[in-house]
Every structure is written in structure tokens, then in C-alpha cells.
A protein has these predicted regions:
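Non-transmembrane amphipathic alpha-helical segments
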Residues: 95-103, 119, 260, 264-274, ...
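Alpha-helical segments in transporter systems
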Residues: 120-123, 284, 312-318
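ABC ATPase nucleotide-binding domains
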Residues: 253-274, 278, 282-293, 525-531
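A short, surface-exposed helix-loop junction/capping segment
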Residues: 112-122, 268-278, 310
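Amphipathic heptad-repeat alpha-helical coiled-coil/stalk segments that mediate oligomerization
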Residues: 303-328
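Short, flexible active-site-proximal loops enriched in glycine and acidic residues
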Residues: 109, 262, 303-306
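ABC transporter TMD-NBD coupling linker
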Residues: 291-309
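ABC ATP-binding cassette signature C-motif
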Residues: 1-253, 321-531
Length: 531
């Protein structure tokens, strides 16, 4: 079994800014701990420090039992086999690479044959073939096909949820006793989230996960570790009691700070009074020096930790008037995904697109954003003055990857730097203005994408899982912004809380039919792959 022990950890960003300080906590054997906190607060960085991908500025990290790591984002240029290998133990990754090199160098010479035989032996000793048996079970459960049939299949042909489910199966069934999971519920449909909650409850592995899904946190986490203001604090209870515990802690910190301020003011007044008296009476000089010393020591110790600052994110999506029919679909059929369906979307409607992973929801939004990008039959038309803006589920934006937020806004929208900074500040992104897009946290990338949609003035919002990487405050700000938006919204979501405020629901059924519903219908069965 395994555990995680973090002691007095500190980490500074490459530009020297401190991100984490005096971070200490322990996740004991079999515990399920959740890291929560604002986007960009350091949750993913903390996971990377524990995984050994980053070196701390100070402090120590100790783990036992082997680490299985799921990252927040997965490169799309891998095969299914490479996707599974990415969450395998290091010794199996090394043995697999050595075997591939030996196989590539194989000739008729006895030396190369001996090297190949040794590589096979090393792969066996590392547990490679045993793990492939596990992977076979994973692909059979997640994709409905054995490993040998899908190992060379491009992972990009799987939905985001299918990729997540596959990696989670591998980690939960694998040999590592400690799991670090960064947003494991992202892209999972409702049955997938329910499955993950049940598996986390049942596993004997030690788990440290990052999530903003309140239902998953309530059902799977037995302790909450909050990352905010550069450090952490631990709530030993579950998520049900966490909001009250956080309010109580903030009130306690506020009271301690007020007491410190009062004592600081009292000591300063005392020093001031004694200094005046000492000028006229030498007998008071010793009392004056003692008071100065006490004040100096008090100030050197410093004030207590301040209460955490609440986020103030202000989304100002504008939109604009369009034709009455914003979207018209006639006998539309997404190739190999849906049966033909008709749809009319009226100006101003808010429609949530629901259904299981792989049912075609994301492809439908992609089609509306760019009809030439998705194979289909039938017709799809956008109404007069309808300008689509597409929020991409996986945040795959090659056009933004190496660019900084301030440069993106000033260049793409012709604004001044001051205007760009004001816009970034409304989204709590001003501190990241000079960070390349690919270095931002998932939540920061999501907020920046929403800001870019706002600045574009698009009149049709196509949002693919927009709340997946957003913390609770950011998700609420987005919801408030959509309420005030003067345009049309279609949003793919598996977030039941987010979906409650929509006007109607477009449901992609497991059998390929697509229908409209006045109430949310959460499908309980995933589609069979290939159907």
C-alpha cells in the first residue's frame, strides 16, 4: 500500500514569482483526498511536484507504493497503446522503449537477435505482458474490443470521455498503489461520473485528485485539501461539511487578523507615548526600550494568515440580434453517429446538448462552427447575422499555444494594452498576461477562451463542456454571463447543476436518434462502439 507525505513545500514559477509556500499535508494509506481551490492556484503544479515532474524550491515529498498519474490534458497524436502506456509504471515504459529499439535493430546477425531476446526478457520481468492482460480487460470494458484490435488505433478517434475512461480503468486496475488524478471526471458523461465515484469508493488505493465536480467530491473524497493564497489547509471531513468549515475558517482568520491589528496599534501607541515621556524623564527610558523591542519582535513574527480573497470574475458576453431562426437542420445525419434529424433553433434560445460519450454531441457543435470539418448528410444553415463562436472541449488551440494572453488580445482584436489588461482583470487573468497559453492551468485556459468569445462579439455560442475545468466561482460567473447574453447558446454538458438553467435539451440517444426534450434526460447507457 502507499501514502503521500508533503512537508514545508515551496515552489516558484520560472519568472521567480512564488506560487506555493509552507505546504504540508499527508494522505494516508487508502485515503481519498481531493485538492480544491481557484483556477491557477497551484493544484496541478502540486500534483506535478508530487509526481516528480517539477523540482520544489524547498521542502520534502515522500511517497510509497508507486505513483500512477493521470494528467489534465492528453496529447491527441497517440495510439490507444501509447495512451495506456502513458499511465504505466516507469519501468514498463523503459522496457517498452528498449524492446522497440531492439526490434527496430533486428537483423540476421546473432548479436541483434540476442539483444532482442534480452529485451523481451526484460519486458517480461518488468511486468509488461502482465500489464497487457490488464489493458485487454480495460479496452474490452471501455471500448468493447480487445487490446490487440485497438492498440494501434489513433487515440484522437476516441471521444474525450472514452480516453479518460480507458486511462482510469488502467490506473485503477494497475500495479501502482498511489494515484494522482488531475480532473479525472472531465469529459465523462453522467454514467461515467457515477462509475468513477463508485470505483473510487471501492478501491483500496490511495488517491489524491483534483476536481470541481461537487457531486463527485461529496461521494468519493473523505478529506478536502484546499489550495489558496499560496498554501494549503486540510479539512478532515468530507465535502458535505466543507463549505461550512471554509466559512468558519475564514471568520476565524479574520478575527485573528483583527486582534493582531488591534495589538499592533496598541504597541505602536505605547512606544509613541513612552518615547515622549522618555524625552523628559530618563527613568522611563528603559520602559521605552523594552516597548520598542516588544514591537520589533511582534512585527518580525508578522500578522496571521489573512482570510482568502474571494474571486470576482465578471463575464460580459454581448452577442447581438440575428434572424429569428438561428440554426436550421434538415435531415441532418452525422456520419456513423446519428440517424437523420430535423432541428430549428430560435434566436435567444439556450439549449443544452446531452447524451453519452461518443454519441456525436461534440461533432455536432464542430459542424455548426465549420460545416466542412465534419462528414455529414442533409443540410445545416445558420440564420442571418449568425456568427458562431466555438469553445473547444479539449482546449486544443495550436493558434494560441505559444502566445501570451496580452499579445493574443492586442493583436487579434486591435485593442490597446490597457484595454487588454482591463479585460484580463475581469477574468482574474491579469497575473498570467505574459504566460504562454499552453502553460496556463486548464481553468485559466477555459476562462481565456470565454473572454475571446466575448471580445469576438459572436452571436451563436457553441460551448463544448465549458465548465469542465472551471472552479465553482468561475462556473457561476459563466452562468451569470450566459443569462445576460443577447444571443443563442448551444452547450454540450454533463454538468447537471449547469444544465438546470437551460430552456430545452437536445438529446443524442444511444441508438443514434436525436430528439428535443423540455427536461434534462441523462442517458444511463453508453453507445456500443461502432454503432
Amino acid at each position: 500500500m502507499g501514502h503521500i507525505d508533503v512537508s514545508d513545500l515551496a515552489y516558484a514559477l520560472p519568472d521567480g514569482r512564488p506560487l506555493l509556500r509552507e505546504v504540508s499535508f499527508r494522505v494516508g494509506q487508502g485515503a481519498k483526498a481531493a485538492l480544491v481551490g481557484p483556477n491557477g492556484g497551484g493544484k496541478t503544479t502540486l500534483l506535478r511536484l508530487i509526481a516528480g515532474e517539477l523540482a520544489p524550491s524547498a521542502g520534502k515529498i515522500a511517497t510509497t507504493g508507486g505513483l500512477g498519474v493521470m494528467r489534465q490534458f492528453t496529447p491527441g497524436d497517440r495510439t490507444v497503446g501509447q495512451l495506456l502506456l502513458s499511465v504505466a509504471p516507469p519501468q514498463i515504459k523503459a522496457a517498452t522503449a528498449a524492446l522497440a529499439r531492439a526490434e527496430a535493430a533486428l537483423t540476421g546477425a546473432s548479436e541483434s537477435q540476442l539483444a532482442y531476446a534480452q529485451a523481451i526478457s526484460d519486458f517480461t520481468d518488468a511486468g509488461g505482458y502482465d500489464l497487457e492482460v490488464v489493458w485487454d480487460a480495460c479496452t474490452t470494458v471501455a471500448l468493447g474490443l480487445p487490446y490487440e484490435q485497438v492498440r494501434d488505433r489513433p487515440a484522437g478517434t476516441l471521444s474525450g470521455g472514452e480516453q479518460k475512461r480507458l486511462m482510469l480503468e488502467a490506473l485503477l486496475r494497475g500495479p501502482d498503489h498511489v494515484l494522482l488524478l488531475d480532473e479525472p471526471d472531465n469529459y465523462l458523461d453522467i454514467p461515467g461520473k457515477q462509475w468513477l465515484e463508485e470505483r473510487l469508493q471501492a478501491t483500496t488505493k490511495t488517491v489524491l485528485l483534483v476536481s470541481h465536480d461537487r457531486r463527485l467530491l461529496a461521494g468519493a473524497a473523505d478529506r478536502i485539501i484546499t489550495v489558496e493564497s499560496g498554501t494549503v489547509w486540510v479539512h478532515g471531513g468530507g465535502f458535505a461539511t466543507y463549505p461550512a468549515a471554509r466559512r468558519d475558517r475564514a471568520a476565524r482568520l479574520d478575527q485573528l487578523r483583527r486582534r493582531w491589528d488591534d495589538e499592533h496599534a496598541r504597541l505602536r501607541r505605547l512606544v509613541h507615548t513612552l518615547r515622549q515621556r522618555a524625552a523628559a524623564n530618563d527613568a522611563v527610558a528603559s520602559s521605552y526600550q523594552a516597548a520598542r523591542t516588544r514591537l520589533a519582535r511582534f512585527e518580525e513574527a508578522g500578522p496571521p494568515e489573512p482570510p482568502p480573497r474571494e474571486q470576482n470574475i465578471r463575464v460580459r458576453l454581448r452577442g447581438g440580434r440575428t434572424g429569428k431562426r438561428a440554426v436550421t437542420c434538415q435531415r441532418l445525419q452525422l456520419a456513423d453517429l446519428t440517424r437523420p434529424f430535423d432541428l430549428e433553433v430560435w434566436y435567444g434560445e439556450r439549449i443544452a446538448v446531452l447524451g453519452a460519450n461518443g454519441s456525436g454531441k461534440s461533432q455536432f457543435l464542430k459542424l455548426l462552427a465549420d460545416p466542412s470539418s465534419v462528414p455529414h448528410h442533409g443540410t445545416v444553415r445558420l440564420g442571418a447575422r449568425v456568427t458562431p463562436g466555438h469553445f473547444v472541449q479539449t482546449h486544443t488551440r495550436p493558434d494560441l499555444r505559444d502566445r501570451t494572453p496580452d499579445e493574443i488580445i492586442t493583436t487579434d482584436f486591435g485593442t490597446t494594452l490597457n484595454d487588454a489588461m482591463r479585460a484580463l482583470a475581469r477574468y482574474e487573468l491579469a497575473p498570467t498576461r505574459r504566460q504562454p497559453f499552453h502553460t496556463l492551468s486548464g481553468g485559466q485556459q477555459a476562462r481565456l477562451q470565454i473572454l475571446l468569445l466575448e471580445l469576438s462579439g459572436c452571436t451563436l455560442l457553441l460551448l463544448d463542456e465549458p465548465t469542465d475545468n472551471l472552479d465553482l466561482a468561475s462556473a457561476q460567473a459563466l452562468q451569470d454571463g450566459l443569462t445576460a447574453y443577447q444571443g443563442t447558446v448551444l452547450a454540450v454538458t454533463h454538468d447537471r447543476w449547469f444544465a438546470e438553467d437551460f430552456d430545452r435539451y437536445l438529446v443524442f440517444d444511444p441508438d443514434g436518434t436525436v430528439h428535443s426534450s423540455a427536461t434534462p434526460t441523462w442517458q444511463v447507457n453508453n453507445r456500443t462502439p461502432g454503432t
